[in-house]
Amino acid sequence: METKVNKNQIKIGNIIINSRVSLAPLAGITDFVLRKLIREYSPTCLLTTEMISSEALVQKPDANISYTDEKESPAAFQIEGHKPELMAKSAKILADKADIIDIKIPV
């Protein structure tokens, strides 16, 4: 049975976001501190981490580039890369903490 959403919600997969506001994934900008500040002013918006290079994440999976806390739910991550095997490994690294994984393939 399909879950209905109202005009003030967005549905991505099985995740319902109770806001039509989303923070864009900007490398060097949307770090944990900014996301925490945005959450105080917009408690229901979708927060997205900085864009994360799949190569960097696979090389250093414990680096703080993917740091989030429970208040960021739903948590969205954008991974960038052009090598399918690295993109898959990156998605697996983030699977436990990500509600949404956005894939950016450079052209």
Predicted segments with their positions:
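Glycine-rich, positively charged N-terminal anion/phosphate-binding segment
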Residues: 2-11, 26-93
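Non-cysteine beta-strand/loop elements that form the S-adenosyl-L-methionine
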Residues: 49, 100-107
